[in-house]
Amino acid sequence: MTKKRVLIANRGEIALRIIRSVKELDMEAIAVYSDVDADSLHVKRADEAYYLGGSLPSESYRNIKTLMKAITDTKADMVHPGYGFLAENADFAKAVQKKGVIWIGPNPETIKSMGDKIESRKLISKAGLKHVPGQLKPSRTKREAT
């Protein structure tokens, strides 16, 4: 039986923590990296490292097209986004799932709902959870907003 392969769509300490967990679960960790991270510890500790190119995050860690190619090229079974970069991007989560790859994180609908303050407040209120008081609809005037 072949080991499951997890592509970690992040860098640095975040990626290192995920790599450690992936290996404890007896799976293969795939790091991704840009020009500036070529010698980073997360690249060295992973079972495999995939070069994304570029030095800016927009060219690498935030580039959905580039990350989707990495998923295909490495034959990853799962994707862990870490946090930041594309971890809260519903479109990235959808693209990963559409490809038939397991997304390790909230489903795209949850990501979208929790990214909208009013929608997330409505969901929390509906669930009966305690939260900071606030509006359940957008302000229409300056007076309503203050």
Question: Which residue ranges define each predicted feature?
Answer:
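N-terminal beta-alpha lobe that positions the nucleotide/phosphoryl donor
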Residues: 1-146
